[in-house]
Every structure is written in C-alpha cells, then in structure tokens.
C-alpha cells in the first residue's frame, strides 16, 4: 500500500550514458526524486532532491535537500522508516536542507554579472512556495555545507526553472 509499494532501493539515481548510448554507469543513488542537477565550474555535480510529503511530521521525514553528488555516493533515501540514518558511514550528508516544497530548476550563478558571492551560489527553485534560494557553499572536508538565502520570493510565483544567459542575466520561469 502507499507510495512506491514494493519498490526496491536505491530509488532515485543519476545515470551517465556514453554518447552512442551503448554504455551506462550508475553514478550516485539514494535519492527520493532527484528533480534537477547542475555542475559547478569545477565539474562537481549538485542534485536537488524532493521530499516525501506523506512522511511530514514523522521522525523519518527528509526535507527537500541539495546534495553534493560525488561518484559512487549513496544518500540513503528509502521508503517509510527504511531511510538510512545520516550517521551511517556509507551515507553522505546533504549540503543543506531546504524544507518542505517542490524542487524544480537548479543552476549555478556562474556567468552572471552579479556580485562575486552570487556568481558562486547555486540557485534552487521551489514551485510550491514560489521561492528561489541562493545557496552559498563553504568547503567542509571533501564536500560542502550550504547556507541558504531567500533570493526571490512572491505569492504566487510558481517557479519552474532558472538559466543564465550569455548577457550575464538570470532568467527564470
């Protein structure tokens, strides 16, 4: 019964295909629903993962989150109470929790004509709450921790995606 009844781990994942489509590689997994991802200027991948609304209020609820998707990473999402605790040695922590919402578009500010702090930020769009967050990354060990900032918000503003134009402007829908 319920969401994903009988579904097996690893649930959401990111896969890489060769240009000819003959080879594929499972890059990282353990997401609930990795809606979008982007690459920073160093080629590191960051994934915006969705929450499971049915779990809200339960001890195993996981909010929407930004994950630093290093090769072979596992983020531990499983249905219901089966989620891996964040202290498992082979489960990577998220960069930042966003909270309840509907993740959609994500992009880095690289190429904008914004102040430097915002050029380095990753931008996350939330459809439900009409909010775009700027997440400022700080190195922590081999990964990052993020500090979120409300960048654009309005009701109604059902955001869907964000892009950076050749003119240095940010565009969003």
Could you describe each region identified by the protein language model?
Residues 1-173:
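Beta-propeller domains with acidic blade repeats across secreted/periplasmic ectodomains
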């Amino acid at each position: 019964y319920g969401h994903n009844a009988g579904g097996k781990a690893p649930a959401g994942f990111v896969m890489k295909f060769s240009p000819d489509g003959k080879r594929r590689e499972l890059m990282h997994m353990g997401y609930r629903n990795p809606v979008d991802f982007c690459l920073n200027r160093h080629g590191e991948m960051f994934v915006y993962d969705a929450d499971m609304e049915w779990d809200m209020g339960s001890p195993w609820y996981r909010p929407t989150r930004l994950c630093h998707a290093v090769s072979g990473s596992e983020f531990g999402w499983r249905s219901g109470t089966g989620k891996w605790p964040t202290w498992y040695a082979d489960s990577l922590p998220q960069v930042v929790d966003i909270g309840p919402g509907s993740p959609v578009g994500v992009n880095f500010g690289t190429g904008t004509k914004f102040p430097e702090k915002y050029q380095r930020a990753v931008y996350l769009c939330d459809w439900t709450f009409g909010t775009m967050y700027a997440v400022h990354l700080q190195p922590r060990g081999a990964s990052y921790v993020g500090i979120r900032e409300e960048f654009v918000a309005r009701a109604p503003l059902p955001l869907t995606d964000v892009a950076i134009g050749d003119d240095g402007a940010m565009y969003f829908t």
